[in-house]
Curated annotation (Swiss-Prot):
<feature type="binding site">
    <location>
        <begin position="138"/>
        <end position="140"/>
    </location>
    <ligand>
        <name>substrate</name>
    </ligand>
</feature>
<feature type="active site">
    <location>
        <position position="318"/>
    </location>
</feature>
<dbReference type="GO" id="GO:0006099">
    <property type="term" value="P:tricarboxylic acid cycle"/>
</dbReference>
<feature type="binding site">
    <location>
        <begin position="324"/>
        <end position="326"/>
    </location>
    <ligand>
        <name>substrate</name>
    </ligand>
</feature>
<feature type="binding site">
    <location>
        <position position="319"/>
    </location>
    <ligand>
        <name>substrate</name>
    </ligand>
</feature>
<feature type="binding site">
    <location>
        <begin position="104"/>
        <end position="106"/>
    </location>
    <ligand>
        <name>substrate</name>
    </ligand>
</feature>
<keyword id="KW-0816">Tricarboxylic acid cycle</keyword>
<feature type="binding site">
    <location>
        <position position="186"/>
    </location>
    <ligand>
        <name>substrate</name>
    </ligand>
</feature>
<protein>
    <recommendedName>
        <fullName>Fumarate hydratase class II</fullName>
        <ecNumber>4.2.1.2</ecNumber>
    </recommendedName>
</protein>
<dbReference type="Pfam" id="PF10415">
    <property type="entry name" value="FumaraseC_C"/>
</dbReference>
<dbReference type="InterPro" id="IPR024083">
    <property type="entry name" value="Fumarase/histidase_N"/>
</dbReference>
<dbReference type="InterPro" id="IPR020557">
    <property type="entry name" value="Fumarate_lyase_CS"/>
</dbReference>
<comment type="pathway">
    <text>Carbohydrate metabolism; tricarboxylic acid cycle; (S)-malate from fumarate: step 1/1.</text>
</comment>
<comment type="similarity">
    <text>Belongs to the class-II fumarase/aspartase family. Fumarase subfamily.</text>
</comment>
<keyword id="KW-0456">Lyase</keyword>
<dbReference type="Pfam" id="PF00206">
    <property type="entry name" value="Lyase_1"/>
</dbReference>
<dbReference type="InterPro" id="IPR008948">
    <property type="entry name" value="L-Aspartase-like"/>
</dbReference>
Amino acid sequence: MSDFMTEQEFRIEHDTMGEVKVPAQALWRAQTQRAVENFPISGRGLESAQIRAMGLLKAACAQVNKDSGALDAAKADAIIAAGKEIATGKHDAEFPIDVFQTGSGTSSNMNTNEVIASIAKANGTEVHPNDDVNMGQSSNDTFPTATHVAATEAAVNDLIPGLKVLHESLAKKANEWDSVVKSGRTHLMDAVPVTLGQEFGGYARQIQLGIERIEATLPRLGELAIGGTAVGTGINTSADFGGKVVAELVELTGVTQLQEAANHFEAQANRDALVEFSGAMRVVAVSLYKIANDIRLMGSGPLTGLGEIQLPDLQPGSSIMPGKVNPVLCETATQVSAQVIGNDAAVAFAGSQGQFELNVFIPVMARNVLESARLLANTARVFATRLVDGIVPNEEHMKQLAESSPSIVTPLNSAIGYEAAAKVAKAALAEGKTIRQTVIDMGFVDGEKLTEEELDKRLDVLAMANTDRKQKF
C-alpha cells in the first residue's frame, strides 16, 4: 500500500536525456526536476521579484512572436496569460530551484518555460516549453534580462521611494531641531557645538546623495540583453525582436528606464551594471550604518550613556533585566548594512566572472542585488516611521553638555591666543569649573583684550553653531 501511494505521488516526464519522476501536482517538468535534484545547496531560491520578471518577459516575448506571425495566436495568448499569472506571485512555489545552480540561469529559464506550458495546458492549450514559450530566446539573454528588469523595477518602485521616506523624516527633524544646541564630537571626543538639526541635516543629505547615486545607475541598469539570444549575435531571432520585447516590458511594468542594450555582446558577457547598482547600494548601507550608530550613541543610557535623545520604546529589551529597552531598529539597520556590504562583495567578485561571451555567476548576483534592494527599502521605511519620527531630544541636557565642553574655548583664540586658550581648557577640566569662570579667574577679562560682555558673546554655544549658514539637505 505504501509503495502504491508513493507511485501515485509522482508522474513521469521526459526531456532529451530521458524520463524523470516529477511530483504529481507540480507545474514544473523534467528539466526543472533534474535541477532540483542536482542543486540541493542552500534551500534559497530566486527572489520573488525575479520570478515576476521572468513571467512578464515570457509574456512580452509571446506578444511579439504573435504580432510577427511566428507564433499561433491561441498559443501566444495562453503563454501571455500564464506569464502574467506567474508575475502576480501566485505560482512562486513552483520555482523550487536553488539559487546556486547553473551560472547562466538556464535551469530557472526552463523552470519558467515548463510552468507556463503546464498552466497553458491546464487552461486547454498545449504549448511546448522550448519551441513556443522560449521562441526567439536563449537562457543567455532571458535570464540577464529578467534580472535587470527586476533590479530596475525594484530600484524605481521600491528602493528609491523607501529612501525618500527616510530622507523626508530626517529633513523634517533637521528643520525642527535647527536651534537645539549640543556638543559636537570628533574622534568621539568633545568638539565645538553644533545643533541636533545640523547633524540630522547631514544625515538627510547622505540619504539624498544615496538616492542620486542609485538614480545615476538606472540608464545602464535598464539596458536589456533580450534579442542577443545565445552569444549576442541574435541567432534564431529577428533583428527587431529585442526592441519590440523591451517596448512590451515597458508597457507591462511602467518602468520607462528599460531599453534595449546598445551592444548585445557587452550585455551578455558582462554584468557591470549590476556591479555598479550594487556598489551604489553599498554606499547607502555605509551611510545607514553611520546614521543608525550615531542615533544609537546619542540615545545611549538612560543614565550612564550620552542620553541626548530619547528613542521610542518599541519592545522589552531583556529577558532577565526588567525595564530595559534597547535601540532595536538601530541594530536592525546596522545588521542590514552589514548584509548589503557583504552582498556587494559577492556581486563584485561574481561580476568579474564573465569569460568571453557570457557571465556565469548571474543567479547569485541577481539574488544578492535584489535582496539588498529589498532590505534597504524596507529598513529605510521602518527606520523612518518607527524610529526617527518618534525621537524626542533632551534639550536642556544637551545644552548643559555643550556648555561644559572644553572645546567651547575655541572662539577665544582670536582674543587671548591659542596657547592661552588651551591653558584655560585644561584648567577648567582639571578644576571642574566652567570655561567662563576659568577665563575670569585666570585674569583674561581685563577690559582691553576681553570684556565680560565680549566673553559671554564668544561663549554663546548656539552662536558658535553658525545656524545662519544654511545647508542643503
